[in-house]
Amino acid sequence: TDPGLVPVDGRNTSGGRGWLGIAGAGCDVQVPFAGLGNWVVGVFGDYSFMDVHEPMQEFLFQGDAKQTDAWAVGGRVGYVVTPSLLAYTNGGYTQSHFNQVNLQAAGLGPVVGFTPANTYNGWFVGGGTEYALNFSWLPISGLFWRNEYRFSSFNKTDLQFSLPTGAPSGLAIHSQPYEQAVLSELVWRFNWH
């Protein structure tokens, strides 16, 4: 904690609710390993735009943290289990942005202060499967159904608690967000055969 600020102690673990959309790009290469050509290595990047609200409770204060966007770059290693199924693990760097949080005293009455918007840096690790949708009735080829679990851990920071006027209160809320996400998405692979 910043030596000039008094920490407001509390531990908050909550689930976010809302929606998100993802756009990404990457490149995978199938490589032989120990005589097996079923291994896949790749790099990727993705950007998530979202409106996810997470309740925040710290000591006597509560508010609603809103996560607005995130991006990640990383690598993955996978194994082609069948010609249509890839199982993989991934990891890398991530960054996410949270808006200003308006705080109320125990959730009652008017806003008594706020914490500033903040961008967090961190790392992620995850894994999942991709299944080729090789159906003759589909108008395009290279369509996959991906299911992925991703755990992200972000840096620690002290968010200064400011009064509604913007004046500093001398209090800080210690924050270290982490996130768990389960995603199911359609992926189109160009140059897939």
Task: For the regions a language model picked out, list residue spans one by one.
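Gram-negative outer-membrane beta-barrel domains
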Residues: 1-193
